[in-house]
Amino acid sequence: MLMITSFANPRVAQAFVDYMATQGVILTIQQHNQSDVWLADESQAERVRAELARFLENPADPRYLAASWQAGHTGSGLHYRRYPFFAALRERAGPVTWVMMIACVVVFIAMQILGDQEVMLWLAWPFDPALKFEFWRYFTHALMHFSLMHILFNLLWWWYLGGAVEKRLGSGKLIVITLISALLSGYVQQKFSGPWFGGLSGVVYALMGYVWLRGERDPQSGIYLQRGLIIFALIWIVAGWFDLFGMSMANGAHIAGLAVGLAMAFVDSLNARKRK
């Protein structure tokens, strides 16, 4: 038996299980704090996870509703059907995921109102020896973003990856990954470019590396990242390193973040195997 995912809303879980039944895949639901979805035939895990990704994008798709009607599990008052986008946001994001997203948005708004330089004077990596004991600076550089595309790209990945880690492994694990990767990726980046940088991408790359390798080595963890996405991450790092797009990228933070995530996943998966 392999646990595929968990849903806070049992009726959302049932909708996914009903749909997979129409595709010839039998899933079961076990109720604990959340509705855990389990797969008996582990050879179908790749297919189920691909379908799950599509389901989370739009759980209100008519094919899922039709599957629930066919199975006799539908009914009225399903708010996730009426507001699928916000339901998907709530379904995947835990409190730490939300707090980080809100903090980044608040800082971004402040940068638009006060200007980048004013905010960076308070949040940037220590740019003067006198600031080295302002410990928040070693982490708050991750909250700053310099364009709408920059913040949207990072927060989308943060929600997708950070939410998965928090839902499956707990808020504590997400906090640890975030703090370690922000600290180490920031340290490496300031060696490359000095202290004037910002963005959540170092943490995002750490989450990419962590989710991918942990899923590969410890499928029972319930987190998973398609190999195509980790390949995309590597291509993006190479493109940034050789300046193929003419964009200013925090290449040091990306590489360091990815390395941190892979290392933490390797250690955690080893510990998980020892406990079995």
Curated annotation (Swiss-Prot):
The chain crosses the membrane at residues 94-114, 142-162, 169-189, 192-212, 229-249, 250-270. InterPro entries: GlpG_N_sf, Peptidase_S54_GlpG_N, Peptidase_S54_rhomboid_dom, Rhomboid-like_sf, Rhomboid_protease_GlpG. It catalyses: Cleaves type-1 transmembrane domains using a catalytic dyad composed of serine and histidine that are contributed by different transmembrane domains. SUPFAM superfamilies: Rhomboid-like. Pfam families: Rhomboid, Rhomboid_N. GO terms for biological process: proteolysis. It is an enzyme of class 3 (hydrolase). It comes from the Bacteria. It is found in: Cell inner membrane. GO terms for cellular component: plasma membrane. One of its GO terms (molecular function) is serine-type endopeptidase activity. The active site is at residues 201, 254. It is a multi-pass membrane protein. Keywords: Cell inner membrane, Cell membrane, Hydrolase, Membrane, Protease, Serine protease, Transmembrane, Transmembrane helix. Its EC number is 3.4.21.105. Rhomboid-type serine protease that catalyzes intramembrane proteolysis. Belongs to the peptidase S54 family. This is Rhomboid protease GlpG. It comes from Shigella dysenteriae serotype 1 (strain Sd197).
